[in-house]
Amino acid sequence: MIWHVQNENFILDSTRIFMKAFHLLLFDGSLIFPECILIFGLILLLMIDSTSDQKDIPWLYFISSTSLVMSITALLFRWREEPMISFSGNFQTNNFNEIFQFLILLCSTLCIPLSVEYIECTEMAITEFLLFVLTATLGGMFLCGANDLITIFVAPECFSLCSYLLSGYTKKDVRSNEATMKYLLMGGASSSILVHGFSWLYGSSGGEIELQEIVNGLINTQMYNSPGISIALIFITVGIGFKLSPAPSHQWTPDVYEGSPTPVVAFLSVTSKVAASASATRIFDIPFYFSSNEWHLLLEILAILSMILGNLIAITQTSMKRMLAYSSIGQIGYVIIGIIVGDSNDGYASMITYMLFYISMNLGTFACIVLFGLRTGTDNIRDYAGLYTKDPFLALSLALCLLSLGGLPPLAGFFGKLYLFWCGWQAGLYFLVLIGLLTSVVSIYYYLKIIKLLMTGRNQEITPHVRNYRRSPLRSNNSIELSMIVCVIASTIPGISMNPIIAIAQDSLF
């Protein structure tokens, strides 16, 4: 009898939960339509993989790419609509969040063709790879629109779990296993630190979890200047710092970059920074509104350390992927300048503009590395010597992307940095801007050192890897070359037509 009553209660509770979930999806589902497209794509991938043989592999790529493109299209159709809060305050839709979601979708769309031939050559499992990429993209999109502490924690965990699995995708590689273990342990520790910071914020605000309600709660409890808020700020900064990987939270980055499959590194190097930047701007700007001086100081310290350490240590690297890892640490220092400037003086607009260019520059560089690695099997910088004599197209593409990363005119990277530094100068961040300019000069040095190797390697310097290099013809429909061409063009031409891009960024935010 007791069991019968308990069983009935369980059925009633389950029915209520299901009906509530259905009600939320029915009335709020249109506000997450781009995310729903990705979920449908994930389900379709699983269905096709479980009901077909290996001959349908092209369909898997087609479905993944199509779902990403359709999600981008849905975002563009929803552009400039009024801000909306859905799912009982857990998710917010506005132009600011959507522009970061667009950048994440753009990263994933470019990374899939970048990975096709690599997966086929290394005989990796294709379906799981695509599932992890789409799920990580989904987690990043939800993080961009997260409006409460629970969603801000769960969404990046969804992204992080997929990142751990992707970084250890080549199970037989010892370096990949080592990178995954370090990534997992440090990721778990940072998540614990982040949750601890959230608990201080939750308690200080009187039990509120929505970002704007936390501000109101801090006013009601008169705790906005309390030591508890300072403790919360420190713990949350450390937790978010792992996702952004500025110094000194950068220890995992070089090892993960070196040990993980190169297409995975390309994906993680851009999507994690875009999603974490979107989350950081909202967390620092809303709940810590009354502690702006404190978090400005913390971020300034992180930016200075990142720009100096990242660019100086990159000079000494012999691995191309480790060099780009330290370069990315320096690049995030520039992005932090835009976060500090904020709404005033176009700080967010300059940050978004630079991130758009950084995506094309970084993915273009990684496309060249993937192509060179598949044809030679090496990642050593010295082995790039004399590549221009064997493959001028690849050498020129890599040189353009590296020059754009360094910030040389008239490439996109130069104008992106110029706009970012100008906004920082107008906001009074003179010391940060000067450090940024000096470290940019340092970065140009190690980029030019690689370009010199590419173009002027003498016969005695050319390694057997390049001497035996075989270039595949362009007519082979190489998907990596397609991604590389798109990224090289995006790293070059937008610098000439900068004003429309800046106008779009400003118009979408303000």
Curated annotation (Swiss-Prot):
It comes from the Eukaryota. Its main location: plastid. One of its GO terms (cellular component) is chloroplast thylakoid membrane. It is an enzyme of class 7 (translocase). One of its GO terms (molecular function) is NADH dehydrogenase (ubiquinone) activity. InterPro entries: NADH-Q_OxRdtase_suN/2, ND/Mrp_TM, Ndh2_N. It is found in: Plastid, Chloroplast thylakoid membrane. Its EC number is 7.1.1.-. It is a multi-pass membrane protein. It catalyses: a plastoquinone + NADH + (n+1) H(+)(in) = a plastoquinol + NAD(+) + n H(+)(out); a plastoquinone + NADPH + (n+1) H(+)(in) = a plastoquinol + NADP(+) + n H(+)(out). This is NAD(P)H-quinone oxidoreductase subunit 2 A, chloroplastic. Belongs to the complex I subunit 2 family. The keyword Transmembrane applies. NDH is composed of at least 16 different subunits, 5 of which are encoded in the nucleus. Keywords: Chloroplast, Membrane, NAD, NADP, Plastid, Plastoquinone, Quinone, Thylakoid, Translocase, Transmembrane, Transmembrane helix, Transport. NDH shuttles electrons from NAD(P)H:plastoquinone, via FMN and iron-sulfur (Fe-S) centers, to quinones in the photosynthetic chain and possibly in a chloroplast respiratory chain. The immediate electron acceptor for the enzyme in this species is believed to be plastoquinone. Couples the redox reaction to proton translocation, and thus conserves the redox energy in a proton gradient. One of its GO terms (biological process) is photosynthesis, light reaction. It comes from Nicotiana sylvestris (Wood tobacco).
